[in-house]
Amino acid sequence: MINQGIKAALNPIAFQGGPFTIHWYGVIIASGVVLALLLAVREGKREGIPEDDFYDYLLWALPIAIICARIYYVVFQWSYYSQHPSEIIAIWDGGIAIYGAILGGFIVLLVFCHYRHLSSWLMMDIIAPTLIMAQGIGRWGNFMNQEAFGDITTRAHLMAQHIPNWIINQMYIGGHYRIPTFLYESLWDLTGFALLMLLRHRKHLFRRGEIFLTYVMWYAFGRFFIEGMRTDSLMLGSIRISQLLSIVFFVSALIILIIRRHKNIPWYYNGINKN
């Protein structure tokens, strides 16, 4: 009786015309990026940072982040891609790793701030809430592709969590219902976004960089536990790579936060002085 609610999976293709195919995955990711950019520009204006700096940063960061995200994924799936090299560039089918994108964007930000004489800590504090918002939105691309899911479960169990039927139906994959880990991470990210925006508007209580460090710890903490429920984790032997990185990032951010608290780091300020 429970399985009577099963419906066909949603079409991952948004638009198709001639040789051109646009996937929902790309549309959703792009929407998250655009919203993040608009929010960063708004927050940057409050700190006296010209909006062109954010456009210029994105111009460099976006392609490099995508490349790094894909490289990260391919490296840890090399046993497959070494046999299917033509699929290495097929990012429209999914297969990018957020940690790779974050690392790529972070490196670009440090270089960009150096040459623009901007405070890297201030820029990271501005970008952190927008980034986790984009991450929360982007997880719905995984939903459309029926990926980033967890172990086998039952429809009754999903209904008991008050998950809408249209999400439950999409979680019917390969003849089984799956734990919607994409949903858990999306909700975790969007909750983190609300928290970080609250901190941004109470920044007088913080030192420079602490909002960004809070983002790192928040995301790493949630990702560690959610990753443990997934069945498609990138592995290094028996170790889930994302869980390992989550531990490294959480501990590193906590140590940096403690060190900066014990140093004579100025409390939050307005302005774009380089530090």
UniProtKB/Swiss-Prot annotation:
GO terms for cellular component: plasma membrane. Its EC number is 2.5.1.145. It is a multi-pass membrane protein. Keywords: Cell membrane, Membrane, Transferase, Transmembrane, Transmembrane helix. The chain crosses the membrane at residues 20-40, 58-78, 88-108, 118-138, 209-229, 239-259. Pfam families: LGT. Pathway: Protein modification; lipoprotein biosynthesis (diacylglyceryl transfer). InterPro entries: Lgt. GO terms for molecular function: phosphatidylglycerol-prolipoprotein diacylglyceryl transferase activity. GO terms for biological process: lipoprotein biosynthetic process. A 1,2-diacyl-sn-glycero-3-phospho-(1'-sn-glycerol) binds at R139. It is found in: Cell membrane. Belongs to the Lgt family. Catalyzes the transfer of the diacylglyceryl group from phosphatidylglycerol to the sulfhydryl group of the N-terminal cysteine of a prolipoprotein, the first step in the formation of mature lipoproteins. This is Phosphatidylglycerol--prolipoprotein diacylglyceryl transferase. It comes from Limosilactobacillus reuteri (strain DSM 20016).
